[in-house]
């Protein structure tokens, strides 16, 4: 598919990326339509994919995507977690329409649905996991491009790119390669200079691993701050004057005491001596006479009632 042009040939850097990501490693099962893309079989039963055929199909898929005038008419889909981030990155780079996550049945066939779309080209990550959009695309005559493993069914798939579509690194690298070739064929980036976007941005990362890395980085930063605060804190030095004789060094203020008493004019006078509180005055009244008289009055009233 490269047409024998040296510009479109696969470089050594691309081969090293494929090998590092494990793109050439297939599965233990083989579909009869995928036999043409197999290089050999290992002793443990894993099939090796021919990377030359992978590169040719990658260029063919990029040419099909570039042929669409409106980039938004290209729909890229990935229902599996390993390809959702790569699909979103590819859509932001090329202008395609992404569907990451669950595909709503009837998106291509049910016109009453709010999420109804009419794309001109469909690109999926896994034909087995994304069987619903591939089936609906066959109803409305939408050509389909798929990343296919050794055991992937090729029913309703027009352009199959043989690769390892199970590994997170392999899937991310394939979408990165496809985005780079699309931008190169459009003339957005040059083939003479490497693309500034790294393939790591297309790799899927487990949220738990990201959280663990953030916690480890926070703990490391905390321990580093504590270490610097303990050992590198400047010690304050206070110079002290040397005193040979302590009696000479201490100055006692010589202030007359009478000065303070003279200034205070609002001091109350001292209280006068009082009588002896233990002696009580003699009472002149006779307290026993009153109750007797009162009692006689009450008795008189009672006799009247009787």
From Swiss-Prot:
Instruction: Give me the Gene Ontology terms describing cellular component.
Output: cytosolic small ribosomal subunit; nucleus; plasma membrane
Region called Disordered, residue ranges: 247-306
Its main localization is membrane
Gene3D superfamilies named among the record's database cross-references: Glucose-6-phosphate isomerase like protein, domain 1
Q: Where in the cell is it found?
A: Cell membrane; Cytoplasm; Nucleus
Q: How is it modified after translation?
A: Acylated. Acylation may be a prerequisite for conversion of the monomeric 37 kDa laminin receptor precursor (37LRP) to the mature dimeric 67 kDa laminin receptor (67LR), and may provide a mechanism for membrane association. Cleaved by stromelysin-3 (ST3) at the cell surface. Cleavage by stromelysin-3 may be a mechanism to alter cell-extracellular matrix interactions.
Role noted for this protein:
Required for the assembly and/or stability of the 40S ribosomal subunit. Required for the processing of the 20S rRNA-precursor to mature 18S rRNA in a late step of the maturation of 40S ribosomal subunits. Also functions as a cell surface receptor for laminin. Plays a role in cell adhesion to the basement membrane and in the consequent activation of signaling transduction pathways. May play a role in cell fate determination and tissue morphogenesis.
The UniProt similarity line reads: Belongs to the universal ribosomal protein uS2 family.
NCBIfam families, A to Z: uS2_euk_arch
Name of the protein in its database record: Small ribosomal subunit protein uS2
Species this chain originates from: Xenopus laevis
The organism's lineage is: Eukaryota, Metazoa, Chordata, Craniata, Vertebrata
Q: Which gene encodes it?
A: rpsa
